[in-house]
């Protein structure tokens, strides 16, 4: 019995470890694992099917084939356990030892390990400081290498050809050693003295000057350091002993018909053994050198193939021309060990079936077919049958169940009661793809799903299937109920808005019952309460849509739970009064006293959750659903072709458009417009026409004329079925109705460009052949896109999950005072996202004061901003708030709850242990399939919209300038002379309502603080010309203006005014190379004037194509335009949109022609140009200069003498995120990434909370680059985890030594995932071979901190309820061994359960 206990303990010990280390195996270690040498290539005897002795399946080496039975059958049964049979050499033990016992092959000649040879950078090459090419020549016997030069002039590691070798031998006899093949490499590696090599390299680094040499040296130093630290020896990279995998991991299975199916590994091993034995024989026979060499080369090749087939040369193929699967292939890729078996396991206890709708279910229920339930809950049913005494044995119980006796169903009912099951729909794109429900037994074979959870599962009932899983253990059931129950997941983790929102039929029903119509039966009646309304409605006294007055009782629930009620008479309709009956107590009636569109219903559910909590909201959502279905059925809404009303104006609008197009066509033929302009204008006309027809159509469908009670004819919203559906948000949108009843409009070609002939017909009129063809053209592209999109989106999600998987909330507060400053997001003057939405659910980083009052803070630091606080901020008209962010969080592992803020799916501060990284990745990846795949060509409407030439304010208020430099013009208006200036309009409370960019040279007619009215124009500029504005008053002097060389005189035919255009330097000829046309401003005496506040002369360098309208010597005032540069009609830069754009941002890719930013603050001047580049100089205030060479074709948007600040754009283009980080720092980079990514999602109408993007950004900024190593162990230019540097610096500061200085580095998500501290996580992501090679050389320890590593080693993850288990283990490791054993037996089961109970408590 004691033995048996020991046996179990033996199994248990392996589970208890804190880290995994990977290293090179030494020959002695390999021998110590081995249970014997495999000497023969034979596998099994074809007659007896018994393994051959000393073969690849030998029982003496690997263990018995049957449990407790030796091969020859002499010893059988347990009593002989541990005996080694003297006849056949087999140990009598369990057969499963054949899965763990290894063998070995003694190689007759050393063999280089291909991973360390060929996996770049080649480790053997770095170690020996030889090129891979050279080492391969030695290994494959093409050249000799000097291993020991002795006293000869030869160098160690020098290559010699056959002839050179013979000459050297004759010359120096035996004074030197040279060899070829792996022995030579082995010898070289063996004789390296790492310590002295290290010292030598460090000295060399100090003395070297060249960049490339430095790189090579630091690489070598790092490698040698790794070997010294890990205790690996370099010669172990060349193998002398080869381990043999246990036979049950490379099985040989007999098929029927006497053939065998075998693992490819057996073939590969057989090859190695054959060649090895042959080589051994040849060496014994003293065969000629050339034969031995050939055999050694073949041995090297066969071992290469075994380890990594196809890495070098052609892959070895089997009988069926298919490359054999080597050991490396076993672990890498989607089908490899990591991704197939360790990260994704299959589940028993599951069933799947088609889903149908279950409109009568409650939100926490699902309908489970009886047959399915019986099969899934079989063991529970068996147990219960036995306990009841209805069956004596399991076998009897089985019979009962198979016969499906009546009592079995009763017992099934009992078993199922309060035992939740998990429903999952593939693809599981976010955590709401698996939810728990209580099963309700139903007849039939389809699972019934509650309609309200369809949005979360993205399910519909056109044949979707779902899987059911049964949580078995008590802990699993508890977690399913407390955390995964559908009733606990009302809010979406992506944006914190309700995801349990009615859609389609339900919305239609609620909308229908809440519409108000004129002059319906019973209009104007007054009712005492809602039940009276109901009675009147049931007796057909009033109609559903009649406007009536009703006395409503309002119940207000205050924060303390006190209830107070009051009554009031409300103007409402019959339908809304009936709706008020299902409102929970405490929800104000005015929320429901509107038209119930999808948006309003969502708002209603949200308010209910915030005001009344979870339980009431769930009940309310269910009631809404039942009511919606009931009234949708009553409404009997249906659509026919007559509902698609075509507006009468359509014909007229089309005729107008056609005339316009014809006119442009004529202009084009007479050469007035270019082909591109013609195309753009035509597309423009048609998109405008399409809009006009759509508007006319919506007016036609959406309104109808009726008589009201007074007999007047008025317009009211129509009850057209088509319109109702779109207006309520039940199905369809304006864009789709436009195609049914307006005009189909412009179509896109598959490459995304727009076909200029639109489809003028709509679907009701029908398309003609050509229109139909154009229509299918675009539609087919759409379908092809969708298929590609799914794969791309999935891959993006995988990369995101991988980079963020180990971000977990680990503590409450890290104590940082850093944060991000949040302001409203403004686009084109409109506030797209007000401040309230951006700061909701965040924690304040520093006290917020009233604007202009620094005494009493409105909100103090570390307050979590909920809806009430945000309303307060809005009333105080605060414009910017500094909030805590995960990017600036200082927790050493994971992030802290304060920096993260509110858990969006629960509505309170996030719990410790929440896996926020994975949630962030899912929230960003899940809507990926809704994003577009195409790049937009700007043209037509888009470029028209770009040409804004003034600012007209939309609201009444006061003007405020931000960051604006301006000069006062003689006319009294201001002229902007900065690029980043902005103008805001504030309302009476000082709240920002609009914000606009002010371009350089804009004339501003309002002053700071002026009052403006809505519709007033406050600034204007010429969008087609970029002005150069004089900042001083004086007289013009032209310099280097040579007529016909640098300038051309032009006279305008219409006005007769003369102007000068600067020519292109390329066309000036050789003698004019040095000429640079400049306009200088001088005073009356002809002395140079300087630009205010600088010592630079007031002169403006004129770029090519600029136009000067003034004459030499003319007087200019401050703010006058000296010259102007025509802008090309809106650059047609393709903007990458949709998914590719998001991927580019997360991968931190540099754009093609990036914007050039100012490297420092200072004054701009231009130096001497080179052939294709112009030289831009920024002069600092302290006189130091920075030069930048810029290609001529790029447009420089700054002028000589202008002041720029560090990081300001100097040359237009898409900014590169690396530049933003380098010049402006982490916060602006975060702001940029968040803004750009949000823009893409916002365009598709997807809401994602900023903090998810911030979590990913934090992971992209994990690494830093060492700029100055100080006294640390890092090297200059090395990239290290930020955390390690911070720890090391803290250590150095304690000892009063110099800490290392570093700069943050931005890595793309793929790079960042591969650069994690955990090699297990990196290897299971991508490039498995490279990661493992690197890790083995370094002897890396994986501390199993992330989620992925723990999944792979088969433990609970250190997040959620698993965090308690890990904390328990850490505490426990301080205990004695015996106590440790009791713990490891049943890993602290009490703890996770307790944690779940707590979690459940704050759910309510």
From Swiss-Prot:
Cited InterPro entries: DNA-dir_RpoC_beta_prime (IPR045867), DNA-dir_RpoC_beta_prime_bact (IPR012754), RNA_pol_asu (IPR000722), RNA_pol_N (IPR006592), RNA_pol_Rpb1_1 (IPR007080), RNA_pol_Rpb1_3 (IPR007066), RNA_pol_Rpb1_3_sf (IPR042102), RNA_pol_Rpb1_4 (IPR007083)
Catalytic activities: RNA(n) + a ribonucleoside 5'-triphosphate = RNA(n+1) + diphosphate
Residues reported in the UniProt entry to bind Zn(2+) 1: 70, 72, 85, 88
Superkingdom per UniProt: Bacteria
GO molecular function, one term: magnesium ion binding
Keyword line: DNA-directed RNA polymerase, Magnesium, Metal-binding, Nucleotidyltransferase, Transcription, Transferase, Zinc
GO cellular component, one term: DNA-directed RNA polymerase complex
Named cofactor requirement(s): Mg(2+); Zn(2+)
Biased composition (Low complexity): 1387-1404
Protein name: DNA-directed RNA polymerase subunit beta'
Organism, as annotated: Xanthomonas euvesicatoria pv. vesicatoria (strain 85-10)
Name of the gene this protein is made from: rpoC
């Amino acid at each position: 019995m004691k033995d048996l206990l020991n046996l179990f303990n033996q199994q248990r010990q392996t589970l208890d470890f804190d880290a995994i280390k990977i290293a090179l195996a030494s020959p002695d270690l390999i021998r110590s694992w081995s249970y014997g040498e495999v000497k023969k290539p034979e596998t099994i005897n074809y007659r007896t099917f018994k393994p051959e002795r000393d073969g690849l399946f030998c029982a003496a080496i690997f263990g018995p084939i049957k449990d407790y039975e030796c091969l020859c059958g002499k010893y059988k049964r347990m009593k002989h356990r541990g005996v080694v049979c003297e006849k056949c050499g087999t140990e009598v033990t369990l057969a499963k030892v054949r899965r763990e016992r290894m063998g070995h092959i003694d190689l007759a000649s050393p063999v280089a390990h291909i991973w360390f040879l060929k996996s770049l950078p080649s480790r053997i090459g770095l170690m020996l400081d030889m090129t891979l090419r050279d080492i391969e020549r030695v290994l494959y016997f093409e050249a000799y290498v000097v291993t020991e030069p002795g006293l000869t002039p030869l160098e160690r590691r020098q290559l010699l050809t056959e002839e050179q070798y013979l000459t050297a031998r004759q010359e120096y006899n035996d004074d030197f050693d040279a060899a070829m093949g792996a022995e030579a490499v082995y010898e070289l590696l063996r004789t390296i003295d790492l310590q002295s090599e290290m010292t030598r390299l460090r000295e060399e680094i100090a003395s070297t000057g060249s960049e490339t040499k430095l790189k090579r040296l630091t690489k070598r130093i790092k490698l040698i350091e790794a070997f010294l630290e890990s205790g690996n020896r370099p010669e172990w990279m060349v193998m002398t002993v080869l381990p043999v995998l246990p036979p049950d991991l490379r099985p040989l299975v007999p098929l029927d018909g006497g053939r065998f199916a075998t693992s490819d590994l057996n073939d590969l091993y057989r090859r190695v053994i054959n060649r090895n034995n042959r080589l051994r024989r040849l060496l014994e026979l003293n065969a000629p050198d050339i034969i031995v060499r050939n055999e050694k080369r073949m041995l090297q090749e066969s071992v290469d193939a075994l380890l990594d087939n196809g890495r070098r040369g052609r892959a070895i193929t089997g009988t069926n021309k298919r490359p054999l699967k080597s050991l490396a292939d076993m672990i890498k890729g989607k089908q490899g060990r990591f991704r197939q078996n360790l990260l994704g396991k299959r589940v028993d206890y599951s069933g799947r079936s088609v889903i149908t709708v279950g409109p009568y279910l409650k939100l926490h229920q699902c309908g489970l077919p009886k047959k399915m339930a019986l099969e899934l809950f079989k063991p529970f049913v068996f147990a219960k049958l036995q306990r009841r005494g209805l069956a004596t044995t399991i076998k009897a119980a089985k019979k009962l169940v198979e016969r499906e006796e009546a009592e079995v169903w009763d017992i099934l009912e009992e078993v199922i009661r309060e035992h939740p099951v998990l429903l999952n729909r593939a693809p599981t794109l976010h955590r709401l793809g698996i939810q728990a429900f209580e099963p309700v037994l139903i007849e039939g074979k389809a699972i019934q799903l509650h309609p309200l959870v369809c949005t979360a599962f993205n399910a519909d009932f056109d044949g979707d299937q779902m899987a059911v899983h049964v949580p078995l253990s008590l802990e699993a059931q508890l977690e399913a109920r407390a955390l995964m129950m559908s009733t606990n997941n009302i809010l979406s983790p992506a944006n914190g808005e309700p995801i349990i929102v009615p859609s389609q039929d339900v919305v239609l029903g609620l909308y229908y019952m809440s519409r108000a119509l004129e002059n319906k039966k019973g209009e104007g009646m007054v009712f005492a309460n809602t039940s009276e309304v109901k009675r009147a409605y049931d007796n057909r006294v009033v109609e559903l849509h009649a406007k009536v007055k009703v006395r409503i009782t309002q119940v207000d629930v205050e924060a303390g739970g006190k209830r107070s009620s009051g009554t009031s008479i409300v103007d409402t309709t019959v339908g809304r009064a009936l709706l008020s009956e299902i409102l929970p107590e405490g929800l104000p009636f005015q929320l429901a006293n509107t038209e119930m569109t999808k948006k309003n219903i969502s708002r209603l559910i949200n308010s209910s959750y915030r005001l009344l909590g979870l339980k009431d909201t769930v009940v309310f959502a269910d009631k809404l659903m039942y009511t919606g279905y009931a009234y949708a059925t009553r409404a009997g809404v249906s659509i026919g072709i007559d509902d698609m009303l075509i507006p009468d104006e359509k014909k007229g609008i089309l005729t107008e458009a056609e005339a316009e197009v014809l006119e442009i066509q004529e202009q084009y033929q007479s050469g007035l417009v270019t082909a591109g302009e013609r195309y753009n204008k035509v597309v423009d006309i048609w998109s405008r026409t399409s809009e006009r027809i759509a508007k006319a159509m919506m007016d036609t469908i959406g309104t109808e004329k009726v008589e009201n009670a007074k007999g007047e004819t008025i317009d009211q919203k129509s009850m057209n079925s088509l319109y109702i559906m779109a207006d309520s948000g039940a199905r369809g949108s304006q864009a789709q109705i436009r195609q049914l009843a307006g005009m189909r409009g412009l179509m896109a070609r598959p490459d995304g460009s727009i076909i200029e002939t639109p489809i003028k017909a709509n679907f009701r009129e029908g398309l003609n052949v050509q229109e139909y063809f154009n229509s299918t053209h675009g539609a087919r592209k759409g379908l092809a896109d969708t298929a590609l999109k799914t794969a791309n989106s999935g891959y993006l999600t995988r990369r995101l999950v991988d980079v963020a998987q180990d971000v977990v909330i680990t503590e409450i507060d890290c104590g940082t005072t850093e944060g991000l400053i949040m302001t409203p997001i403004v686009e084109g003057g409109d506030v797209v996202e007000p401040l309230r939405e951006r700061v909701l659910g965040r924690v304040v980083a520093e006290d917020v004061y009233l604007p202009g009052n620094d005494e009493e803070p409105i909100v103090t630091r570390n307050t979590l901003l909920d809806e009430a606080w945000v309303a307060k901020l809005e009333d105080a008209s605060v414009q910017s708030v500094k909030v805590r962010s995960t990017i600036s969080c200082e927790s050493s592992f994971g992030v802290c709850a304060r920096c993260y803020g509110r858990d969006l799916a629960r509505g309170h501060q996030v719990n410790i242990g929440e896996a926020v990284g994975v949630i962030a990745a899912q929230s960003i990846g899940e809507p990926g399939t809704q994003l577009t795949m195409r790049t937009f060509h700007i043209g037509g409407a888009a470029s028209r919209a770009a040409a804004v030439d003034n600012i007209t304010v939309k609201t009444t208020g006061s003007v405020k300038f931000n960051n604006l430099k301006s000069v006062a013009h003689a006319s009294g208006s201001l002229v902007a002379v900065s690029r980043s200036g902005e103008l805001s309009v504030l309302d009476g409370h000082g709240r920002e309502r609009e914000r606009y960019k002010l371009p350089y040279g804009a004339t501003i007619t309002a002053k700071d603080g002026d009052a403006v009215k809505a519709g007033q124009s406050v600034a204007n500029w010429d969008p087609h010309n970029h002005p150069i504005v004089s900042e001083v008053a004086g007289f013009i002097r032209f310099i280097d203006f040579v007529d016909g060389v640098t300038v051309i005189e032009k006279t305008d035919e219409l006005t007769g005014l003369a102007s000068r255009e600067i020519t292109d330097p390329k066309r000036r000829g050789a003698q004019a190379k040095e000429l640079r046309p400049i306009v200088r401003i001088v005073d009356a005496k002809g002395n140079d004037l300087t630009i205010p506040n600088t010592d630079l002369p007031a002169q403006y360098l004129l770029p090519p194509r600029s136009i000067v309208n003034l004459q030499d010597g003319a007087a200019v005032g401050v703010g006058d335009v000296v010259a102007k540069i025509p802008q090309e009609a809106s650059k047609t830069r393709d903007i990458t949109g949709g998914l590719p754009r998001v991927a580019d941002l997360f991968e931190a890719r540099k754009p093609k022609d990036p914007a050039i930013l100012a490297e420092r603050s200072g004054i701009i001047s231009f130096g001497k140009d080179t052939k294709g580049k112009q030289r831009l100089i920024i002069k600092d205030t302290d006189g130091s200069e920075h030069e930048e060479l810029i290609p001529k074709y790029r447009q420089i948007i700054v002028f000589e003498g202008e002041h720029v600040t560090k990081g300001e754009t100097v040359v237009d283009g898409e900014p590169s995120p690396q530049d933003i980080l380098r010049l402006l720092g982490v916060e602006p980079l975060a702001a940029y990434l968040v803004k750009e990514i949000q823009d893409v999602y916002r365009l598709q109408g997807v809401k994602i909370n900023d903090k998810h993007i911030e979590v990913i950004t934090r992971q992209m900024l994990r690494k830093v680059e060492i700029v100055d190593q100080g006294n640390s162990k890092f090297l200059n230019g090395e990239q290290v985890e930020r955390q390690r540097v911070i720890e090391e610096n803290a250590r150095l500061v304690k000892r009063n030594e110099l800490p290392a200085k570093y700069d943050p580095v931005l890595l793309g998500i793929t790079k960042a995932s591969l650069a994690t501290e955990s090699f297990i996580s990196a290897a299971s992501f991508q490039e498995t071979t490279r990661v493992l090679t690197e890790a083995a050389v370094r002897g890396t320890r994986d501390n199993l901190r992330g989620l992925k590593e723990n999944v792979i080693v088969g433990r609970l993850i250190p997040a959620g309820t698993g965090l308690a288990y890990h904390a328990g283990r850490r505490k426990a490791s301080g205990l004695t061994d015996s106590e440790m054993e009791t713990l490891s037996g049943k890993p602290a089961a009490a703890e996770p359960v307790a944690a779940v109970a707590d979690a459940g408590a704050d759910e309510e």
